[in-house]
């Protein structure tokens, strides 16, 4: 049966790779969105013929409407447009490939409309994991992870046959600054931080990989997806990015998922699950890989990890504060306003300054995010 797919953030890194794998699966695209990359969105829209498209930026949407005037594609804008593409486009499954907190409201709207979620926007679970997972259960929808690590864990968990898992082994590449001490990283430039050794990703997530905040965010995401306390999620640095993560069971057995670092495979699996279909990605040869290495992370050199672990242990609004502060600080770094090691320092200051709230609503999440950004940008 052909699936109807909405791709939120279709012009970004995950979005374009989602478009790349569409010929391999039986799918119809019903909605596409961008922030302001309307030339690429026009190209995608003319090729895929969606029912609706959205440019978050209002001026970009006006220009896009002119570009697509000869089609019957509805052009929307703003958060209302993004939510409409998620919830009102007729999609069976929504790929949430937008970056940052902007993904939360459309994801919740899609869940409440009964759409399955192919989740690439980790911030949604980091900020409001309890609310999102509760809503998914209430509305009977599946959250299918697109992150390579969480896709790996998802696949390993299938081997549990209903038995509980003891521990998640969450692998991390270590980023471009693996092995360096914090003093060595103080003067690191934007270009150095964006030089990831294994993965091709957007700028924000690449900086998060360099600070290792990305792995901290993924720890919180795993906590909510797999209902495990943070102390049962172990971060392991694995430089080759071949073992995408692993799960340990009660008897001590460990099952891992391996593959070359290519996001198209977990994207495709999220869209075809529980079926597997051929994927046009390079096949792995263990003989050519030859060696796999594993290390404990350096928590002193990468303080973002401890900040994330502390936020995970407290839950409540701490995930929203952590994420909002980090997004703002990464933006400052990318624009040359602060240094590399200032990112974690700004996040720590926000966590220390904003009063903790344990029992939260969606409005509390949005308020915590806003407060964190204001403090960092202050």
Spell out what each predicted region is.
Residues 1-378:
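Catalytic, metal-anchored helix/loop core of enzyme active sites in primary metabolism
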């Amino acid at each position: 049966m052909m699936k109807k797919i909405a791709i939120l953030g279709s012009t970004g890194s995950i979005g374009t790779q989602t478009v790349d794998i569409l010929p391999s699966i039986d799918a119809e695209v019903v909605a596409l969105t961008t922030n302001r990359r309307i030339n690429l969105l026009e190209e995608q829209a003319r090729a895929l013929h969606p029912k609706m498209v959205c440019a978050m930026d209002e001026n970009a949407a006006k220009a896009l409407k002119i570009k697509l005037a000869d089609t019957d594609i509805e052009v929307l804008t703003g958060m209302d447009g993004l939510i409409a593409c998620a919830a009102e486009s007729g999609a069976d499954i929504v790929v949430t490939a937008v970056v940052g907190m902007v993904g939360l409201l459309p994801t919740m709207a899609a869940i409440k409309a009964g759409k399955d979620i192919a989740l690439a926007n980790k911030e949604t679970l980091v900020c409001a994991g309890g609310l999102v997972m509760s809503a998914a259960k209430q509305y009977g929808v599946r959250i299918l992870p697109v992150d390579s690590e969480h896709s790996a864990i998802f696949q390993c968990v299938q081997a549990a046959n209903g038995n509980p898992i003891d521990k998640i082994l969450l692998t991390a590449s270590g980023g471009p600054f693996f092995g360096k001490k914090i003093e060595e990283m103080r003067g690191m430039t934007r270009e150095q931080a964006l030089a990831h050794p294994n993965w091709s990703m957007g700028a924000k997530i690449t900086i998060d990989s360099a600070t290792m905040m990305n792995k901290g965010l993924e720890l919180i995401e795993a906590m909510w997806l797999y209902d495990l306390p943070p102390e049962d999620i172990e971060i392991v640095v694995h430089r080759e990015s071949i073992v995408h993560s692993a799960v340990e069971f009660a008897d001590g057995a460990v099952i891992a998922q391996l593959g070359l670092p290519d996001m198209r495979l977990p994207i495709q699996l999220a869209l075809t699950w529980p079926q597997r279909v051929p994927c046009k990605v390079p096949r792995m040869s263990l003989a050519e890989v030859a060696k796999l290495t594993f290390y404990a992370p350096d928590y002193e050199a990468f303080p973002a990890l401890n900040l994330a672990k502390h936020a995970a242990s407290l839950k409540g609004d701490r995930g929203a504060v952590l994420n909002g502060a980090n997004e703002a600080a990464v933006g400052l770094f990318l624009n040359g306003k602060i240094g590399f090691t200032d990112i974690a320092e700004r996040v720590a200051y926000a966590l220390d300054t904003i009063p903790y709230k344990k029992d939260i609503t969606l409005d509390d999440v949005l308020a915590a995010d806003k407060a964190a950004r204001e403090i960092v940008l202050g």
